[in-house]
From Swiss-Prot:
Disulfide pattern: none
Protein name in UniProt: SsrA-binding protein
Keywords on record: Cytoplasm, RNA-binding
Source taxon at top rank: Bacteria
Primary localisation category: cytoplasm
Family: Belongs to the SmpB family.
InterPro entries: SmpB, SsrA-bd_prot, SsrA-bd_prot_CS
GO molecular-function term, one example from the UniProt record: RNA binding
PANTHER family assigned to the protein according to its UniProt record, in alphabetical order: SSRA-BINDING PROTEIN, TMRNA-BINDING COMPONENT OF TRANS-TRANSLATION TAGGING COMPLEX
GO BP terms in the entry: trans-translation
Gene3D superfamilies reported in the protein's UniProt record: 2.40.280.10
Subcellular localization(s) per the UniProt record: Cytoplasm
Organism: Chelativorans sp. (strain BNC1)
Lineage: Bacteria, Pseudomonadati, Pseudomonadota, Alphaproteobacteria, Hyphomicrobiales
Amino acid sequence: MAKNTNITTVADNRKARFSYEVIDTLEAGLVLSGTEVKSLREGHANIQESYAAVEGGEIWLINSHIPEYFAGNRFNHEPRRRRKLLLSKKEMARLAQAVEREGMTMVPLKLYFNERGIAKLLLAIARGKKLHDKRETLKQRDWSREQARLLKERG
């Protein structure tokens, strides 16, 4: 099978950018079984309700859903199992510090295959937005749409 030369997005967490203020992002690898990779290659995954947590000095992706591979029979994986994230020790220490000291959270933004065909997760260090911040974001979005519409009508 020929490898793709471009990045293929499998799952996108668009709600995270609305609900959280993204401070920093980094790329992490995932420990996956064979049937999970096959299911991801078909484009099946959901990271909307997932988050990352530090447990025992390691970082885990919790509550992500990768459905069973239809041809996997008895070797199939559990769809909502915890998945270990592959990061350097320096990155793990920085994430653990941000979560514990600064009260931030780790939110997955995007699950994709890189140009070498390896599954990667774009992980964000984020701070939760308050309700008034979310309303302000909606107002800004509506105003920018209105501006674009007005400019299109005039010019």
